[in-house]
């Protein structure tokens, strides 16, 4: 679980996302409140429920990017799902309870990695002994009688192994055979039954081992993983993972505006209002049955986001609106924002193109005038056609660099300066012609 302060979280998000301070602050406070809640007494902790967030803003302004970056900062089970992938219970398609099952799977993976990291030292020792046994096998008749000379030889080989002198030497070792992958095709909505059947068939096979010949360096890695897996207690793992999901789990529901009921539609709407009704108990708090055990959703944080271009937040059913109490509006991006997006974030678009062309030996230099012209071109196209936010920069940059990308392999050692004239020469006719920009940019 992350112990970062709200200021630290916002600072980290600032290095990847330009603007949208309100959204960053809300997300940072929500994440910090997870930590604050765990510091309370047990009886009070149970009463403090998360304040779910609804992010509203046009496409391409950073809603999904905030979710992606938050997943790395949270150090907790996190899942991002598209609301449009689900249908009402009883109809063809995924049920919303699958969200919690996927979140639990993510917690199992996270917990297993943590537990294996804790016992890595013991696993390395056990793996080292197995490699030495393969290098210095004892005669069967002398298996129980260890001579001093044998021990001295073993220590010599141990030293060489640790120094990497034996990395390229090949040995034969017994490695746990991978379980046979049994793929079962199931109708949509029956994923849980499929998982149970797969688990049943996999558990029927004995834990056989397979003798393989490989370099010591590769064998050492495989044996460490195998020994670490043996040291992890499966029951404790499930118990800790479920506790982690219940107390620290975060679900990011993207495209929630796409499941708003349209005013002109009539009859049952199984992929819109039906999904909203199914989401209610999850967000409010219920118990979901997963293959790892029962999971309570009372303290899972839900962050929903949507562009709401064809609908508005009030089109969500009232009960769901009430369960998303914190509303954050993200602002549309200006030409100045585009300039900052091109230069300020870590691994910005301009940095990426400079690095990509550098692999061909071509040096690309972006001048301030060129960056201003690119930002202005992207903003103009957004204003004249559909406003798709910062995603327009990808289209404009790809079009701008298309010719150079094609010829880069023949221009090794050359220098290309991207200034206002370069941008005008490559983009001006497309930006000015509305029909061309509509279909090409």
UniProtKB/Swiss-Prot annotation:
GO CC aspect terms: HslUV protease complex
Matching Pfam families: AAA, AAA_2
Location (main, coarse): cytoplasm
Keywords: ATP-binding, Chaperone, Cytoplasm, Nucleotide-binding, Stress response
Cellular localization per UniProt: Cytoplasm
GO MF annotation list: ATP binding; ATP hydrolysis activity; peptidase activity; proteasome-activating activity
Residues reported to bind ATP: 18, 60-65, 254, 319, 391
GO process annotations (BP): protein unfolding; proteolysis involved in protein catabolic process
Keyword Metal-binding listed: no
Recorded family membership: Belongs to the ClpX chaperone family. HslU subfamily.
Function description: ATPase subunit of a proteasome-like degradation complex; this subunit has chaperone activity. The binding of ATP and its subsequent hydrolysis by HslU are essential for unfolding of protein substrates subsequently hydrolyzed by HslV. HslU recognizes the N-terminal part of its protein substrates and unfolds these before they are guided to HslV for hydrolysis.
Subunit structure comment from the entry: A double ring-shaped homohexamer of HslV is capped on each side by a ring-shaped HslU homohexamer. The assembly of the HslU/HslV complex is dependent on binding of ATP.
Entry protein name: ATP-dependent protease ATPase subunit HslU
Native organism: Shewanella piezotolerans (strain WP3 / JCM 13877)
Gene designation per UniProt: hslU
């Amino acid at each position: 679980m992350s112990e970062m302060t709200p200021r630290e979280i916002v600072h980290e998000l600032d290095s990847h996302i330009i603007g949208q301070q309100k959204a960053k602050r809300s997300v940072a406070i929500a994440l910090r409140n997870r930590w604050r809640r765990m510091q309370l007494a047990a009886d009070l902790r149970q009463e403090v429920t998360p304040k779910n967030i609804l992010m509203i803003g046009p496409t391409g302004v950073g809603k999904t990017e905030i979710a992606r970056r938050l997943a790395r900062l949270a150090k907790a089970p996190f899942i991002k799902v598209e609301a449009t992938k689900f249908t009402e219970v009883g109809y063809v398609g995924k049920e919303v309870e699958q969200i919690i099952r996927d979140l639990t799977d993510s917690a199992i993976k996270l917990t297993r990695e943590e537990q294996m990291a804790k016992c890595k030292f013991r696993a390395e020792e056990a793996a080292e002994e197995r490699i030495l046994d393969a290098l210095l096998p004892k005669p069967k008749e002398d298996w129980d009688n260890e001579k001093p000379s044998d021990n001295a030889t073993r220590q010599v080989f141990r030293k060489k192994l640790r120094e990497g002198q034996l990395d390229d030497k090949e040995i034969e070792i017994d490695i746990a055979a991978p379980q046979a992958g049994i793929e079962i095709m199931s109708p949509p909505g029956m994923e849980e039954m499929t998982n149970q059947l797969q688990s049943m068939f996999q558990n029927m096979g004995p834990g056989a081992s397979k003798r393989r010949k490989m370099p010591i360096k590769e064998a050492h890695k495989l044996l460490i993983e195998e020994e670490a897996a043996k040291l992890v207690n499966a029951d404790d793992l499930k118990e800790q993972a479920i506790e982690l999901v219940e107390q620290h789990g975060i679900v990011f529901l993207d495209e929630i505006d796409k499941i708003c009921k349209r005013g002109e539609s009539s009859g049952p709407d199984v992929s819109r209002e039906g999904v909203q009704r199914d989401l209610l108990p999850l967000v409010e708090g219920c118990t979901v049955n997963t293959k790892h055990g029962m999971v309570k959703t009372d303290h899972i944080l839900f962050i929903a986001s949507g562009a709401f271009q064809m609908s508005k937040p009030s089109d969500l059913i009232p009960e769901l609106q009430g369960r998303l109490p914190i509303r954050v509006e993200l602002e549309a991006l200006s030409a100045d924002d585009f300039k900052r997006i091109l230069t300020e974030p870590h691994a910005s678009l301009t940095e990426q193109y400079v690095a990509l062309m550098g692999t061909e030996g071509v040096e690309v230099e972006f001048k301030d005038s060129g960056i201003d012209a690119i930002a202005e071109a992207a903003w103009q196209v957004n204003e004249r056609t559909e406003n798709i936010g910062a995603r327009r920069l990808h289209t404009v940059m790809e079009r701008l660099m298309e010719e150079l990308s094609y010829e880069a392999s023949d221009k090794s050692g050359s220098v290309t300066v991207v200034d206002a004239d370069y941008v005008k020469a490559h983009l001006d006719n497309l930006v000015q012609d509305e029909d061309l920009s509509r279909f090409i940019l």
